[in-house]
């Protein structure tokens, strides 16, 4: 008789809405431990099967999910690590993880952002801090609250090793949460970072009362900008019309639960960006990504009017009205091969 194989333990690092949602999904598939900084949140998850701070009182988590504030405990028992911490804290957590984690444990990022200062994608940081550990990203049109409430959704798991990606995808998959695989890590990560910037642009439009046609125009042209930069950075063109690109772009631009759309709306209401950030309980990655995206655009010689106008509002004192006037001033050219808005 064959010996029983131990089920791999998934360790999710981070206590926000999406990290908790993914942890609850994984706990329904196998042993899962979630590391959180807050003892109150850990107790809420363990005793009440809820993360009331980020998901409210109505979302009930898997009763097999356990939370801890002991980082060493979490790191030492991990067979798979899922990174749910924001981009600004991502590297620091990985550095601490490197002191405890055994070799070759796969590390999957949930973060759709770029590191300020280095302009690195999250998988690049994983490879730098944890060499030898397979790195991937899980991304797609995933509003955390909807997934946690059981609405049907899908994501794509991007890893260079498709055999490993196929094995790991089963840990995230449920009847209502479909998980596809791809080897285009660059494309998926680039799309995830860019869509946040474009959602801010659409949010600014909502604040101005623009029509549905105008919103569709901005989203469609945003997809072109996303694809141009993503391909220039090494992504595959076919990734961007998919879940991580167009799918995530649509939901982040249109959902009332979107943090980045909210930032755009608040900018349109005349609030300073620092005040908006301070009032939010979770991170809107598009705020930090806007300047980084423009650095890449300049590096590759690309005209990205939507990203440029968002960066101008967030970092250079422009107004929402000036941003949309700037877009309209762009002369339209060839829809596919043109360089303007």
UniProtKB/Swiss-Prot annotation:
Residues engaged in binding NADPH: 17-18, 37, 112, 144, 259, 283, 285
Gene3D superfamilies reported in the protein's UniProt record: N-(1-d-carboxylethyl)-l-norvaline Dehydrogenase, domain 2, NAD(P)-binding Rossmann-like Domain
Catalysed transformations (reactions): sn-glycerol 3-phosphate + NAD(+) = dihydroxyacetone phosphate + NADH + H(+); sn-glycerol 3-phosphate + NADP(+) = dihydroxyacetone phosphate + NADPH + H(+)
Catalytic activity, EC: 1.1.1.94
Entry function: Catalyzes the reduction of the glycolytic intermediate dihydroxyacetone phosphate (DHAP) to sn-glycerol 3-phosphate (G3P), the key precursor for phospholipid synthesis.
HAMAP family reported for this sequence: NAD_Glyc3P_dehydrog
Name the record gives this protein: Glycerol-3-phosphate dehydrogenase [NAD(P)+] 1
Location of this chain's protein in the cell: Cytoplasm
SUPFAM superfamilies hit by this protein: 6-phosphogluconate dehydrogenase C-terminal domain-like, NAD(P)-binding Rossmann-fold domains
Sites where the protein binds sn-glycerol 3-phosphate: 112, 140, 195, 248, 258-260
Keywords, comma-separated and alphabetical: Cytoplasm, Lipid biosynthesis, Lipid metabolism, NAD, NADP, Nucleotide-binding, Oxidoreductase, Phospholipid biosynthesis, Phospholipid metabolism
